[in-house]
From Swiss-Prot:
One of its GO terms (molecular function) is RNA binding. Residues 42-105 form the S4 RNA-binding domain. Coiled coil: none annotated. This is Small ribosomal subunit protein eS4. One of its GO terms (cellular component) is cytosolic small ribosomal subunit. The keyword Ribosomal protein applies. Component of the small ribosomal subunit. Part of the small subunit (SSU) processome, composed of more than 70 proteins and the RNA chaperone small nucleolar RNA (snoRNA) U3. One of its GO terms (biological process) is chordate embryonic development. It is found in: Cytoplasm; Nucleus, Nucleolus. HAMAP family: Ribosomal_eS4. Its main location: cytoplasm.
Length: 263
């Protein structure tokens, strides 16, 4: 019988979007407990070593982190298996680089560089709103932040913009039709579009219909929707492709066209 927390993660059982090959070893870094779920996060070590190629081994990542070079959401993190997740801002002051963890249309975390100006804030989805002790209202976000005394107009599923220096809410976007959203789970993970309508199913999952910028429509559960902008204006910069998923044939044609133009 297992007693206590699991401390290991086999490479074969690691989430597919980490893109670890099966033959390099037996184990994968098991993310520490933190603000994002194990299957929905990217450990810091994989981001620095496998994505940015700033280190060759786990030991080198540890040396980088222990020199306090890496900040996540404005806080220094020295744990190499710290779970970074959707919308987190990773800053490396030594190189003057800032990254926002955001999904590409294949559902993987992409290396998305952002400006210093954009690195000062992040967007968070409101998961719960509760009244705490002594009648103090709280809201809980997707990255496990608890914020007291929020604006009473903010409801569950809305998106708030948080200033990372102060941790205060500076603005918010309502969850409503016509707003821009990104899908953060399910088969359409990473796609971006405008909310067209919401089907309510009491006792089951609400379904949201989304239309992307080239006119393709798709539907997903309400829990997978993350509002990222008012109307067609996103509040964060978007990765290449702008969240439009192409069919296999369209991707092939695009590759061939790029090949011909370069030759």
């Amino acid at each position: 019988m297992a007693r206590g927390p699991k401390k290991h993660l086999k490479r074969v059982a690691a989430p597919k979007h980490w893109m670890l090959d099966k033959l390099t070893g037996v184990f994968a870094p098991r993310p520490s407990t933190g603000p994002h779920k194990l299957r929905e996060c990217l450990p810091l070590i994989i981001f620095l070593r496998n994505r940015l190629k700033y280190a060759l081994t786990g030991d080198e990542v540890k040396k980088i982190c222990m020199q306090r070079f890496i900040k996540i959401d404005g806080k220094v993190r020295t744990d190499i298996t710290y779970p970074t997740g959707f919308m987190d801002v990773v800053s490396i002051e030594k190189t003057g680089e800032n990254f926002r963890l955001i999904y590409d249309v294949k559902g993987r975390f992409t290396v998305h560089r952002i400006t210093n100006e954009e690195a000062k804030y992040k967007l968070c989805k409101v998961r719960k709103i509760l009244i705490g002790t002594k009648g103090i209202p709280h809201l809980v976000t997707h990255d496990a932040r608890t914020i007291r005394y929020p604006d009473p107009l903010i409801k569950v599923n809305d998106t708030i913009r948080i200033d990372l220096d102060t941790g205060k809410i500076t603005d918010f976007i309502k969850f409503e039709t016509g707003n821009m959203c990104m899908v953060t789970g399910g088969a359409n993970l990473g796609r971006i579009g405008v909310i067209t309508n919401r089907e309510k199913h009491p006792g089951s999952f609400d379904v949201v219909h989304v239309k992307d910028s080239i006119g393709n429509s798709f539907a997903t559960r309400l829990s997978n929707i993350f509002v990222i902008g008012k109307g067609n204006k996103p509040w964060v910069s978007l990765p290449r492709g702008k969240g439009v998923r192409l069919t296999i044939a369209e991707e092939r044609d695009k590759r061939l066209a790029a090949k011909q133009s370069s030759s």
